[in-house]
UniProtKB/Swiss-Prot annotation:
The chain crosses the membrane at residues 64-84, 122-142. GO terms for molecular function: phosphotyrosine residue binding; protein tyrosine phosphatase activity. It catalyses: O-phospho-L-tyrosyl-[protein] + H2O = L-tyrosyl-[protein] + phosphate. One of its GO terms (cellular component) is endoplasmic reticulum membrane. It comes from Mus musculus (Mouse). Gene3D superfamilies: Protein tyrosine phosphatase superfamily. The active site is at C472 (phosphocysteine intermediate). May regulate the activity of several effector molecules involved in synaptic plasticity and neuronal cell survival, including MAPKs, Src family kinases and NMDA receptors. This is Tyrosine-protein phosphatase non-receptor type 5. Phosphorylation at Ser-221 by PKA deactivates PTPN5. Phosphorylation at Thr-231 and Ser-244 by MAPKs stabilizes the phosphatase, dephosphorylation of these sites results in ubiquitin-mediated degradation of the active phosphatase. The modification Phosphoserine is found at S221, S244.
Length: 541
């Protein structure tokens, strides 16, 4: 059956004339209308399909329906295995029913004519569809399910929230790489205990209130300090204090912990933040329980009420009234130096208004030749009182006169003279200004340069130099970084190795919380790695 017989009733195409021939004809012939279309017969003849066509061939329409059905079954199988098959099957069935209803009303379409496919075409379509179905099912079955994230063990909870350092390896050298700087939130110098204490103004020594706080709420300033109110071994009645097993174990750790690092080990460890983080959190803080101090009015002498001097090493001021323990109190500790030498440094808090006179009493009493200040006057809030004069001031009979101020890129050096009666002394005051607010420096060379300058100034004082006073705001974070860097530089020069872990433990024995944050602990390792490289270059030259 030919196509012209099937498509009866449709207008037949008119044969178009060539342009050349049409131009040569008379105008009357050009305007002749086309012959009228033949009228459709009243009863179109219907031809039967060829014998055997239904059993050995497949129409285009049926082939497309078969292909669509196979794809539908494939999608059903995949979605059924994934758990969404039931709802998807119902929705798709409704859609197909609606589509078939619309197609039935459209009538025959020219391209779905009587064309047939032979058996080879049918086999090719079936083979292709089967191959697609089998490949998809095998891929779905062989695909490994995603592994659920492993929960962190309880002891790693604190490590998981630790900040990344605000410096990179490329920033240890003198050149700065702008792309390496990380914009991080502020790191508070805050010890970690179990609950949070709300601190009243310094003039109001009222009772303290305790409330629960999440970790993110603690990340403020040093005012939001924490306090363990349930220390094992603490006697609730009275002020008696017993050493708990936990504290005894912490004391043993501080005495025995050590990890000697050679040059290559130091460089590798400085680049491993996870190892440094795990090591830092193993070191006990060794903070002082406030119950150890039963001194009325002590709150007026401390900048932060939970950062107190460890009793065995604290500095005691000479006082004309031995019955008044408050007059001899200052929040400061003697710190041992390289090889355990006693009273090499004094770590203290940044003076407040009520302790400026006590601070200068300590400077005169200890015959201090050098003061190192590593904080700004204000960083979000007050960190230190400006305890030195513009020109001259007198505190407790000590006349303090600023002779000269030297400005450098990273610090300011004040040459100060002290006079009491007929005795006169000289004092160097280094104010390190390159430590950024609430985080560690981006570069280590400025701190190493300051350490070298202070060491040279101390050597000029002779072999028996009096203690060097170092302070920041609380007297434990940046102060600990400076003292640890100074001690480790001496060890690296003399022994060729360095033990930062042992140095940190020694500092915390003398004053709790020294090197206060993990970021500061990493920074000390980076500074020492850079210093070792500098020593290697000098020796090779």
């Amino acid at each position: 059956m030919c196509c012209s017989e099937r498509l009866l009733g449709l207008p037949q195409p008119v044969e178009m004339e060539a342009p050349d021939e049409a131009e040569g004809l008379p105008s009357k012939q050009k305007e002749m209308p086309p012959p009228p279309p033949p009228s459709p017969p009243s009863e179109p003849a219907q031809k039967l399909p060829p014998q055997g066509a239904g059993s050995h061939s497949l129409t285009v329409r049926s082939s497309l329906c078969l292909f669509a059905a196979s794809q539908f079954l494939l999608a059903c199988g995949v979605l059924w295995l994934s758990g969404h098959g039931h709802s998807w099957l119902q929705n798709t069935t409704d859609l197909i029913s609606s589509s078939l209803t619309v197609l039935n009303h459209l009538g025959p379409v020219a391209w779905l004519g009587s064309g047939t496919w032979g058996i080879p075409s049918l086999l090719l379509v079936s083979l292709t569809v089967s191959l697609v179905i089998v490949t998809t099912l095998v891929w779905h079955l062989l695909k490994a399910p995603p592994e659920p994230p492993a929960p962190l063990p309880p002891e790693d909870r604190r490590q998981s929230v630790s900040r990344q350092p605000s410096f990179t390896y490329s920033e240890w050298m003198e050149e700065k790489v702008e792309d390496d700087f990380l914009d991080l939130d502020a790191v508070p110098e805050t010890p970690v205990f179990d609950c949070v204490m709300d601190i009243k103004p310094e003039t109001d020594p009222a009772s303290l209130t305790v409330k629960s706080m999440g970790l993110q709420e603690r990340r403020g300033s040093n005012v939001s300090l924490t306090l363990d109110m349930c220390t094992p071994g603490c006697n609730e009645e009275g002020f008696g204090y017993l050493v708990s097993p936990r504290e005894e174990s912490a004391h043993e750790y501080l005495l025995s912990a050590s990890r000697v690092l050679r040059a290559e080990e130091l460089h590798e460890k400085a680049l491993d933040p996870f190892l440094l983080q795990a090591e830092f959190f193993e070191i006990p803080m060794n903070f002082v329980d406030p119950k150890e101090y039963d001194i009325p009015g002590l709150v007026r002498k401390n900048r932060y009420k939970t950062i107190l001097p460890n009793p065995h090493s604290r500095v005691r001021l000479t006082s004309p009234d031995p019955e008044d323990p408050l007059s001899s109190y200052i929040n400061a500790n003697y710190i041992r130096g390289y090889s355990g030498e006693e009273k090499v440094y004094i770590a203290t808090q940044g003076p407040i208004v009520s302790t400026v006179a006590d601070f200068w009493r300590m400077v005169w009493q200890e015959r201090t030749p050098i003061i190192v200040m590593i904080t700004n006057i204000e960083e979000m809030n007050e960190k230190c009182t400006e305890y030195w004069p513009e020109e001259q001031v007198v505190h407790d009979g000590v006349e303090i006169t600023v002779q000269k101020v030297i400005h450098t890129e990273d610090y300011r050096l004040r040459l100060i003279s002290l006079r009491r009666g007929t005795e006169e002394r000289s004092l160097k005051h280094y104010w390190f200004t390159s430590w950024p607010d609430q985080k560690t420096p981006d570069r280590a060379p400025p701190l190493l340069h300051l350490v070298r300058e202070v060491e040279e100034a101390a050597q000029q004082e002779g072999p028996h130099c009096s203690p060097i006073i170092v302070h920041c705001s609380a007297g434990i974070g940046r102060t600990g970084c400076f003292i640890a860097t100074s001690i480790c530089c001496q060890q690296l020069r003399r022994e060729g190795v360095v033990d930062i872990l042992k140095t940190t433990c020694q500092l915390r024995q003398d004053r709790g919380g020294m090197i206060q944050t993990c970021e500061q602990y990493q920074f000390v390792h980076h500074a020492m790695s850079l210093y070792e490289k500098q020593l290697s270059l000098q020796s090779s030259e």
